[in-house]
């Protein structure tokens, strides 16, 4: 793992993954994502039953998506596969099973302390 990154993202769910992708699209190349779980999208993995529908619009509430990740209705499995593919295709660094304990500002950078240190 590198010591200095342009951006560090805490949380490997859909929002964290999207933040990493958007950062790279904007030209920020040294990106790392920290996730305390064994894989991305822990909430979906843990609380959604197998084959459960994952809808783009929650209970009919239309959401206008802006950005570079295409999201569509699917199942738990197809949604997890989609995010696997997005991570692989974009090539940002991901540290799973890495819980961020604190972040401290130090001059013009931030220090990130994890349970692993």
Predicted regions: what they are:
Residues 3-33:
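N-terminal Rossmann-like FAD-binding beta1-loop-alpha1 element of flavoenzymes
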Residues 41:
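Short alpha-helix immediately C-terminal to the canonical SAM-binding loop
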């Amino acid at each position: 793992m590198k010591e200095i990154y342009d951006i560090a993202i805490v949380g490997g769910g859909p929002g964290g993954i999207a933040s990493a992708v958007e950062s790279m699209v904007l030209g920020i190349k040294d990106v790392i994502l920290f996730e305390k779980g064994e894989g991305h999208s822990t909430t979906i993995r843990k609380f959604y039953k197998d084959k459960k529908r994952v809808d783009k619009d929650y209970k009919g509430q239309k959401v206008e998506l802006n950005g570079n990740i295409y999201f569509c209705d699917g199942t738990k499995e197809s949604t997890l596969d989609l995010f696997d593919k997005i991570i692989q295709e974009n090539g940002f660094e991901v540290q799973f099973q890495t819980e961020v304990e604190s972040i401290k500002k130090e001059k013009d950078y931030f220090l990130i302390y994890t349970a692993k240190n």
